[in-house]
Amino acid sequence: MRIDGRENKQLRPVHMEKHFIKHAEGSVFITVGDTKVICTASIDDKVPPFMRGGGKGWITAEYAMLPRATEQRNVRESSKGKLSGRTMEIQRLIGRALRSVVNLDKLGEKTVWIDCDVIQADGGTRTASITGAYVAMVLAFAKLMEEKKLDELPVNDFLAATSVGIDPEHGIILDLNYAEDARAEVDMNIVMTGAGRFVEIQGTGEEATFSREQLNELLDTAEVGIRQLIDIQRKTLGELAMQIDIKRSEESGDT
């Protein structure tokens, strides 16, 4: 048994509450164990200067943590006057991941602003942010469709993320909490689509090297978790999930 009593390939309890923020076009409050993140998607009717006139949309993300999201208080980055390298990396990861499953041509010249605010951190904040932000983004697109500002849902697949690692006592484990992450010999963040395609693989041998065989098992374990996360996304999105399935079939030619 792991630190919190889970099996090696078991996710922490996951819950998504949609429409959590009333002003945002799309919003989700996601909890993954004791990690809690508010994800919102806001629509801006313009694109960055480098994209003007191209007819395509854009998706970008911001990520932040409350000072007491962690055990010891952190100074707000706004007080420091600059973002940390970690924050910039996570913001780019979230935006990159979401863009991978959206047809930006069908979005038109609009920008989707994703905001992921961690209110409590216990490991896996970036993967929880991606998983929740995806749902918030789809909800925002649905609102645009209701308002006749989009003709169709521009999303062509599901998207979710989780962590895997090699624990010195338990071996390969899924969805690391903070204590597990701190002692892991190897840890990875994996982002995948509903079709089982990889969007991002971030892996590091913190205290040890790892073999190709272990890498394959890590990826297989991540896929187990991501399939479960996508099932939760489906339940949260309801009928919108069926529209995404249709889009995926059309894109792959499996109609």
UniProtKB/Swiss-Prot annotation:
Keywords annotated in UniProt: Nucleotidyltransferase, RNA-binding, rRNA processing, Transferase, tRNA processing, tRNA-binding
Xref: PROSITE patterns: RIBONUCLEASE_PH
EC id: 2.7.7.56
Residues noted as binding phosphate in the record, renumbered to the chain: R86, G124, T125, R126
GO biological process, one term: rRNA catabolic process
Keyword Transit peptide annotated: no
Enzyme class, first EC level, given as a word: transferase
Alphabetized Gene3D superfamilies for the sequence: GHMP Kinase, N-terminal domain (3.30.230.70)
Catalytic activity: tRNA(n+1) + phosphate = tRNA(n) + a ribonucleoside 5'-diphosphate
Pfam families, per database record: RNase_PH, RNase_PH_C
InterPro entries linked: ExoRNase_PH_dom1, ExoRNase_PH_dom2, ExoRNase_PH_dom2_sf, PNPase/RNase_PH_dom_sf, Ribosomal_Su5_D2-typ_SF, RNase_PH, RNase_PH_bac-type, RNase_PH_CS
Molecular function as annotated in GO: 3'-5'-RNA exonuclease activity; tRNA binding; tRNA nucleotidyltransferase activity
Family annotation (NCBIfam families): RNasePH
Function: Phosphorolytic 3'-5' exoribonuclease that plays an important role in tRNA 3'-end maturation. Removes nucleotide residues following the 3'-CCA terminus of tRNAs; can also add nucleotides to the ends of RNA molecules by using nucleoside diphosphates as substrates, but this may not be physiologically important. Probably plays a role in initiation of 16S rRNA degradation (leading to ribosome degradation) during starvation.
Quaternary structure (record): Homohexameric ring arranged as a trimer of dimers.
Recorded family membership: Belongs to the RNase PH family.
Protein name: Ribonuclease PH
Species name: Geobacillus sp. (strain WCH70)
Gene that produces this protein: rph
